[in-house]
């Protein structure tokens, strides 16, 4: 029984990971926005890691993208634990491609950020995620 449960759990993790990784490819260019195409406003941004970035990631991302999430079976690839500003800076382009502005493949599920929050995330990332 244990091996069957483990197999189903592994299949579920792989299925979620596959959908998360390949769903953007199915849409082609429809709605996909790139970080390099989004300009920081001329006046810059008032958004900062604390409180905006850290709180946004805690609320919408760290349920899966946090230290220990992989151990809980979420299937998050190594290097995508968004608990520190340094990791977020290193993954800025990828975060933008999946969750900012008109990009809505992350987070999966019913707890999507409102469009206004995604726009703030886009601005923050486009301005270098200060």
Q: Which residues does each predicted region cover?
A:
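Aromatic- and Gly/Pro-enriched helix-to-coil junctions and flexible linker segments
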Residues: 28-130
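Sec-dependent bacterial lipoprotein signal peptides
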Residues: 1-28
């Amino acid at each position: 029984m244990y091996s069957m449960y483990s197999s189903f759990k592994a299949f579920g993790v792989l299925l979620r990971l596959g959908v998360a990784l390949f769903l953007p490819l199915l849409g082609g260019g429809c709605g996909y926005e790139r970080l390099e195409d989004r300009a920081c406003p001329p006046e810059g941004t008032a958004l900062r890691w604390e409180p905006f970035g850290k709180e946004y990631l805690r609320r919408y991302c760290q349920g899966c993208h946090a230290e220990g999430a992989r151990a809980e079976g979420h299937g998050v690839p190594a290097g995508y634990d968004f608990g520190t500003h340094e990791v977020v800076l290193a993954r800025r382009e990828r975060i933008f491609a999946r969750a900012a502005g008109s990009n809505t493949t992350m987070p999966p599920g019913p707890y999507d950020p409102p469009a206004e929050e995604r726009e703030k995330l886009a601005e923050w990332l486009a301005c270098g995620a200060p």
